[in-house]
Swiss-Prot record:
Gene name of the record: tusA
GO terms classed as biological process: tRNA wobble position uridine thiolation
Predominant location category: cytoplasm
GO molecular function, one term: sulfur carrier activity
Pfam families: TusA
Record Gene3D superfamilies: TusA-like domain
Subcellular location field: Cytoplasm
Gene Ontology terms: cellular component: cytoplasm
InterPro entries (UniProt xref): Sulphur_carrier_TusA (IPR022931), TusA-like (IPR001455), TusA-like_sf (IPR036868)
Catalytic site: C19
Matching NCBIfam families: PRK00299.1
Function: Sulfur carrier protein which probably makes part of a sulfur-relay system.
Protein name: Sulfur carrier protein TusA
Length: 82
């Protein structure tokens, strides 16, 4: 799937934050979302390229797209597996 930020229902600006803050903020934000909603995460910490996909697998969310070729890194996360 190509990266389409318009799919997002919420946006989390995590630029300038360092590990583990971006993933902690993703977890807090996604907790208050409904299943099926999509979160756009913008971050510039290189560890997010590893941590966000791992978070999605561990917490049963879908990483539907990622753009990590340039800063800020951007991720589209769909809450839940459905």
């Amino acid at each position: 799937m190509s990266f389409n930020p318009e799919l997002a229902t919420k946006t989390l600006e995590a630029e300038g934050l360092r590990c583990p803050e971006p993933v902690m903020m993703v977890r807090k934000t996604i907790r208050n979302m409904q299943d099926g909603e999509v979160l756009l995460v913008k971050a510039d910490d290189p560890s997010t390229t590893r941590d966000i996909p791992s978070f999605c697998r561990f917490m049963d969310h879908q990483l539907i797209a990622a753009q990590t070729d340039q800063l800020p890194y951007q991720y589209l996360i769909k809450k839940g597996l459905e």
